[in-house]
Each structure stands twice: as structure tokens, then as C-alpha cells.
Amino acid sequence: ERAADLARRAASVSHDGGAVHAAQLLAAMESQAFVERDVQRLLDVGLAQIPRRSIIRRLAADIRAWHARYDDWHACYGEIAAHYGYDKYTGNCHVVPNHALILMALLYGGDSFQRALTIVNTAPSFRF
């Protein structure tokens, strides 16, 4: 809770809405990762810190469902592009598609942070 609160305070200086919620979710996950290795449980911890009606919560639920449906992250990436692609959000670097890639990479990376980094850094080359 403290990590999410600090992230909210810091993010609120220059952002609002989904960007703040994304920061809270990741901060909570990161702080809990010192004692928990299961990504699904870490995601639950992060989601508990953001509002139920947040776009980030909806995005996380969709990515979890696609992760359960598809063994290959490329298929999940296609769903992200169709539902949360950069063409659907304005700005140079919108948090929604970027956060989707982070969550996808963490879920498909499993217990390998190296694999997660490979996925998240490879995915953008498959352009939305």
C-alpha cells in the first residue's frame, strides 16, 4: 500500500487517471516482488491498489484472459493491438498501450525476467 501511495503522489505531479493507476499497480507489484515470485499474485496485489473502474484494471483483465487463451505472446500482442493499440489513444507515448506491453511481457516471461525483457523490447517491432 505504501509503495502504491508513493507512486500515486509522484505520478500525480504530472499525470492523472490511467497513468497514475499504472504507476500504482507497478509500484505495488515491484515492492511485493521481494517476497513473492508468482506474477499472477503480484498482479493481484497491484490491482488491489487501483479503482475498479480504471482502464488499467480492464486492460489487465483482458491481458490475463488472452494469456490464458494463447500460448504464444504474439497472439496476445495482436489482441492488444486490436483493443488497446496506439491508434486508439492520443499522444506521443500513451500509458495504456505501453502498460499493456509490460503486463503481457511479465505474464509470458513467467519466472524469467530476462524473457520478459526480451518480449517487451521485441514486441514494439511488430507495430500496432
Give, region by region, the residue ranges found by the protein language model.
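Hydrophobic, membrane-interfacing alpha helices
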Residues: A19-H21, L25
